[in-house]
UniProtKB/Swiss-Prot annotation:
Organism encoding this protein: Frankia casuarinae (strain DSM 45818 / CECT 9043 / HFP020203 / CcI3)
Biased composition (Low complexity): 278-288, 337-396
Entry's Gene Ontology molecular function annotations: double-stranded DNA binding
InterPro entries with a match to the protein in the record: Ku70/Ku80_beta-barrel_dom, Prok_Ku, SPOC-like_C_dom_sf
Highest taxon of the lineage: Bacteria
Domain Ku: 9-189
Protein name: Non-homologous end joining protein Ku
Amino acid sequence: MRATWKGVISFGLVSIPVRLYSATQERDVAFHQVRRSDGSRIRYRRVAEADGDEVNYADIAKGYELPDGETVVLTDEDFANLPLSTSRAIDVLEFVPLEQVDPIYFAKSYYVEPDRTGAKPYVLLRDALAASGRVALVKIALRQREQLATLRVRGGVFVLETMVWPDEVRQPDFPFLEEDVAVRPQELSVAASLIHTLAADFDPTRYTDNYREALQAVIDAKVAGREVVASPGGPASEAVGDLMAALRASIAAARAGRPGEAAVAGGAAVAGGAAVADGDAGPAAAGVTDEGPDDKASDDKASDDKASDGRRGGRTSSVKGASSAPGTRSTARKTPSSTRSTAKTNAATKTPPAKTSAAKASAAKTSAAKATSSRTAPKTAPRTPTSKTPPTRRSA
């Protein structure tokens, strides 16, 4: 590694000579700008605006433009002679708890290495700082600007974390912060269950840069002359509709992807016995199912017979069709599930009614009797297709 800064740590009357090294490096794939047709590199020249002449890098300085358009030129010597104690020193201001420093202030990390002559005071300060459980708040001048920073211990060495100034932290000004967004306790409970399901110890080595790997694979395929196969796109982003359903599905997916976690079908259960019902349970949750009619009425059924079936609302069963085959069907206001199953079986095997004018006439004359029968105890009513007299009612 190449040192990016040299100076001292100023700690009271103690000065520790140190060097800074960048603690991180980006692994992005590097590209050059080229001409599309032949891949020829695009080059830029430093040209003076006044005369168009190319300027050597050694002749370039920094300029500050005044409001009237005039420019003040500053050289490297001007920056080197700044009247700042932090230009070549890390000034320790105070020692603060790390948890009180909001991570939003952190900018860049540097390793701090001691010079040969400063190894002992370096180790002394390192061990004392580690035992205190605090971090040193310091000031340092880097790249022509003074910065706040923290000094902490990591892996036996000091790590300098540069920080932004408080007036450089932007404040969120979002409209929803002014709105009264209500969150129900049931929703909060399910969200907490999802967090519990995904809880883990921090281990960044488990994750990789999938985009960079895919990009490198495309480059390698281009070099080898292979065809680049486009990967299928991810799921399209959709607006959140049923929030509770989305949370439950997320819990089920998270548990299914973890060993030892039972997958929750449809997100019906949550960790720790937290309630998942949102108070608006559908018919299935309450044990209620939609029940259609046992069978469809014949096209030849009389209109008054249809009206009588509509009043029953599917809750009772009666003999349908005036010319049905003789038989009995139980009727009741509250039919158990076993009875309903039997009734449906009977309905499935019912013979079609005979299409005779006599049967239609019989059905018209006996509609009142059938309506009364549907509201009373179970009865059977054998029908004689050719008879015009009301059928004899017998007990089941």
